[in-house]
Amino acid sequence: MAANSWEQLIASWEPRMRQAFLDAVYQIRDSVKLTELVRLIEAGRIDDAVRAVGLDPGKFRSMTSTLLAAYEAAGVATMLAIPPAAVAAGYTLKISFNASAKAAADFLRYRSELLIREITEDQRRGIRDVLVRGLESGRGPRDVATDLLGRRNRITGKREHGLIGLTQTQQEWARNYARELATGDPAALKRAMRDAAFDNRIRRAIAEKRGLTIEEARAPFRAYLHRALRVRADLIARQEMRGALHASQHEAYLQAIAAGQLDADQIEREWRSRRDERVRSTHRKEDSVHQGIDGHVRGINELFVSPRAT
């Protein structure tokens, strides 16, 4: 498949997975009964409060559906790009991609289960941590519940600026940012996910040797939470879609080889990184600084081996 067609496929599916994740997060937040959650927190029933949030796999069905649809679309596109093979005088062989083939079905089942398990387990740990920290700090049960769920937007009806949906690490970063705002710590101006539109407000407080008031800190903190959730959605979309699309492309080639439409030695794979700061050094273009594998070419059944053998 041509490189531009492949990038178009990625550009088409990443936004869909991003939105599927955000929809799942908002659905979880909106489905929680606030009064019941507050009651459980007030009673100190942490385990029951975590369960009340309702992190069942069904809430993420749109993500698994998107994964399946993207996988099939990539397989179909790859197969269409493979030229038919001449098998006899006047006859050619041109097969269709089979997303129900055992290897394809096994991959989709494994990847879907792993994706949802990783998200839900991290969320449960994060929710528990928020609840425990809230109770230990003496915050009111309703305030703790609101930290998790966010507040309902009067226009959209959705609960926004909650901690649900963020990773545990992101939740910790958010707490640190809130502390920096409250104490006038200059480190608040170095947070990558902050909204720079509020920098002057923060600088004024620092110059006056004070922290931001609760009212002053509300908007920059909410903007930080909003951006953090988008970063989380972007990361999931990028990882899951690229992984699924590459796996589907590989499976399509294997199906074509098995059917006799292609010979294995006709296929070469080239490692292409994003070539930005997020790419690990061993996956970059090899130069005087990096001994990476970007640009390396291998056959269909050959492994890419980095200098560190990872």
Please name every model-derived segment.
Residues 213, 220-310:
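Acidic, glycine-rich two-metal-ion catalytic cores of nucleic acid-processing enzymes
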Residues 1-226:
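N-terminal leader/targeting and assembly helices and adjacent pre-domain segments
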